[in-house]
Amino acid sequence: MAQPPPDQNFYHHPLPHTHTHPHPHSHPHPHSHPHPHHQHPQLQLPPQFRNPFDLLFDERTGAINYNYIRPYLPNQMPKPDVFPSEELPDSLVMRRPRRTRTTFTSSQIAELEQHFLQGRYLTAPRLADLSAKLALGTAQVKIWFKNRRRRHKIQSDQHKDQSYEGMPLSPGMKQSDGDPPSLQTLSLGGGATPNALTPSPTPSTPTAHMTEHYSESFNAYYNYNGGHNHAQANRHMHMQYPSGGGPGPGSTNVNGGQFFQQQQVHNHQQQLHHQGNHVPHQMQQQQQQAQQQQYHHFDFQQKQASACRVLVKDEPEADYNFNSSYYMRSGMSGATASASAVARGAASPGSEVYEPLTPKNDESPSLCGIGIGGPCAIAVGETEAADDMDDGTSKKTTLQILEPLKGLDKSCDDGSSDDMSTGIRALAGTGNRGAAFAKFGKPSPPQGPQPPLGMGGVAMGESNQYQCTMDTIMQAYNPHRNAAGNSQFAYCFN
């Protein structure tokens, strides 16, 4: 069996010679020395392990391994006799030398602290100057600054946590003596400057910006601050509109009246508040609700730059005609108001339930029997509108369902009517015809008394064709106006 070469790195020195000795060796001698070899006790090994390199050399790692022969070795191996002069020097021992800790004097620490207050990080010129001045190495100075920055960060975090836990801090509160001087410069200097690390307490009075843009929390803020924001709001309104008018020349007398009415409400509440603080809580809540409603009403009335007018659902709006164009609103007379009320009730029967954005015509069943004596509209072929609805049992195609929509103007010409068209015709017959429909083109000439329903001729069809188109557009636009806000409205004619 071929023997591999002995490992030359075993114990950092070459292995001893392997020629035959006068005395038998069971393993190579661990140390090479000039004096005669010391004999070790004979090991009882199996005959196949007589050659020591058959066991000690590991072919996988290329190094000597004792694990193969360990079961055959005695528990107590005799130590070879090694003289002290033959021990390995310290340079051959793979051990990291322990670095001695640097002890700084009090004068050095004071000088380092002074430089740390000037700047937490060292530049190359400062490092060279400071190390030469203190007779220290540059590595020692850099390590001291690194540890000092870490300690400063920990102290800053602890101080910040204490400030948040005990918020708000009293003006006379001083920091502990253990804090670094850099943090003491940020503390309250006799109550003259606010603490930079502590958030300021809640302000006593809100600004006009908060009062204008945070109107949702207006009531809760009033309860907390005891009504001081009313005086601030009054001052804001006086500065914005000193003459009592609106934001521009287009403001109406209604807006001016509401402005003065709101000022009177504010002044009245201020007098009640300053007369005594023992007002019952229930009366105070009622005043707050009334004031909040007035505030919201005034705020929405003044915003005229928006393209679509914002409507508050709970407020009565009797001063405007909603069935006319929203570009040409005008005041209504008594007869016109009654007709408009009927038409508005037919267009949106539930004001709080928004209807989908689908155009309604005279054959729509949702308008049947809603108004005062409003029967269902009858189509041209004497077919009721309820028959046009798909209840799931009939198998109508889309073209069959949309067929009544194509004959919309024809059905209007034949005299089929509902409450919406009646209200619009009554409105168009008054003197407000030009104001109501000036946007959509030239209005039809004034008509005489209309013939009974179902008896219309060619002349009546020509005069009512324009009106039927307007009815359909307004019926589709009313639910969109109530629900859509500032979004655009589009109507497609078939």
UniProtKB/Swiss-Prot annotation:
Gene Ontology, cellular component aspect: nucleus
Ranges of the DNA-binding region feature: 97-156
Residue stretches of biased makeup (Basic residues): 14-40
SUPFAM superfamilies (UniProt xref): Homeodomain-like
Transmembrane stretches, start-end: none
Location of the protein in the cell: Nucleus
Keywords: Developmental protein, DNA-binding, Homeobox, Nucleus, RNA-binding, Transcription, Transcription regulation
GO molecular function, one term: RNA polymerase II cis-regulatory region sequence-specific DNA binding
Annotated spans, RNA-binding: 433-440
UniProt region (Disordered), positions on chain: 1-49, 149-210, 263-293
PROSITE patterns given in the database record: HOMEOBOX_1, HOMEOBOX_2
GO biological process, alphabetically ordered: anterior region determination; anterior/posterior axis specification; anterior/posterior axis specification, embryo; maternal determination of anterior/posterior axis, embryo; negative regulation of translation; oogenesis; positive regulation of transcription by RNA polymerase II; regulation of DNA-templated transcription
Outcome when changing M460L: In strain: Oregon-R, Z145, Z266, Z346 and Z398
Pfam families: Homeodomain
Chief place where the protein resides: nucleus
Organs and tissues of expression: Maternal expression is an anterior cap concentrated in the cortical cytoplasm. Its transcript is produced maternally and sequestered near the anterior pole of the mature oocyte. After egg deposition, it is translated into protein, which diffuses toward the posterior, forming a long-range anterior gradient.
Effect of A337S: In strain: Z95, Z197 and Z229
PANTHER family: PANCREAS_DUODENUM HOMEOBOX PROTEIN 1, PROTEIN ZERKNUELLT 1-RELATED
Description of how the protein assembles with itself and partners: Interacts with Bin1; in vitro and yeast cells. Interacts with bin3.
Protein function: Segment polarity transcription factor that provides positional cues for the development of head and thoracic segments. Forms a protein concentration gradient that patterns the anterior-posterior axis during embryogenesis and promotes the expression of anterior gap genes, such as hunchback (hb), ocelliless (oc), and buttonhead (btd). Binds to regulatory DNA sequences containing a 5'-TAATCC-3' sequence motif. Also binds RNA. Interacts with Bin1 to repress transcription of bicoid target genes in the anterior tip of the embryo; a process known as retraction.
Protein name: Homeotic protein bicoid
Organism, as annotated: Drosophila melanogaster
Taxonomic lineage from the root: Eukaryota, Metazoa, Ecdysozoa, Arthropoda, Hexapoda
